[in-house]
């Protein structure tokens, strides 16, 4: 019996951001307890067929926690015990910032979705560096980098570079986030000239060739997606994360009129479309992290089949609860058996073969 699903109606009565804060605090506490390892047997699904080796890193499974849930790495020690193969902290900016005024996070239960306009609220790169220093985890930890609101677009590369260098030895991989709709002008940084400057400066500072990725919006046209993909090749990026939240609102059942990025089930098909486009454009040579609307094993398999090497969840995890990871991984293992693949990595892009 999934206790979370029984309790969800009660949990969803609370303000979304307050509930988030309480959950993060509880997870941070649990991660420090002697019995934290016991959670592995409850929520984990160890299966060597699901292991992914990418960028010189080993992922016990392809399912990771997307950036945004644990912005300040407060509960970073918990994610490996909840079955995740990796986790991404942030978005972190050079300067600490409070984000946008509340309310700024909204649930859309009828659509299995959420709208957020958080605005990169975080403690800043220096604080994150202090929190991560001297600690090690059993899964790869990525760091998602954003631009401070006070920093002009013309100085964006300075902002990203500061955070990158400050956190360089503390992350297993890094993500350039230029696709959040909640920081004024940020999406302009997806333009080839602006993004190219950021990537060039980061790669010049990338002495140990840490995996560097870019996270793109689902609202880009195909020409713009292709331009970003070309930049990834030009600057030797390790991959792309597809996709961030959307500003589109088509097909929603909810009549909530709030600005911000929409995540969850309504994003599922578009993000998979973008993944498939990038896979086809690069003939599978650019690793893709697929995110957007993953609630089930079927959703996860679709993204892998369309070209994703790794996956991330956030909104689906809020709706489905902590047992979701185990259910998805078990479903992927079953799909492997039915599809005749010996290992999950063989299934990447199989929709096009």
UniProtKB/Swiss-Prot annotation:
It is found in: Cell membrane. It is a peripheral membrane protein. It comes from the Bacteria. Its main location: membrane. InterPro entries: Aldolase_TIM, DHO_dehydrogenase, Dihydroorotate_DH_1_2, Dihydroorotate_DH_2, Dihydroorotate_DH_cat, Dihydroorotate_DH_CS. Its EC number is 1.3.5.2. GO terms for biological process: 'de novo' pyrimidine nucleobase biosynthetic process; 'de novo' UMP biosynthetic process; pyrimidine ribonucleotide biosynthetic process. Binds 1 FMN per subunit. It is an enzyme of class 1 (oxidoreductase). FMN binds at residues 67-71, 91, 144, 177, 215, 243, 264, 293, 314-315. Pathway: Pyrimidine metabolism; UMP biosynthesis via de novo pathway; orotate from (S)-dihydroorotate (quinone route): step 1/1. Keywords: Cell membrane, Flavoprotein, FMN, Membrane, Oxidoreductase, Pyrimidine biosynthesis. One of its GO terms (molecular function) is dihydroorotate dehydrogenase activity. Coiled coil: none annotated. Its cofactor is FMN. Gene3D superfamilies: Aldolase class I (3.20.20.70). Substrate binds at residues 71, 116-120, 177, 182, 244-245. Catalyzes the conversion of dihydroorotate to orotate with quinone as electron acceptor. This is Dihydroorotate dehydrogenase (quinone). The gene is pyrD.
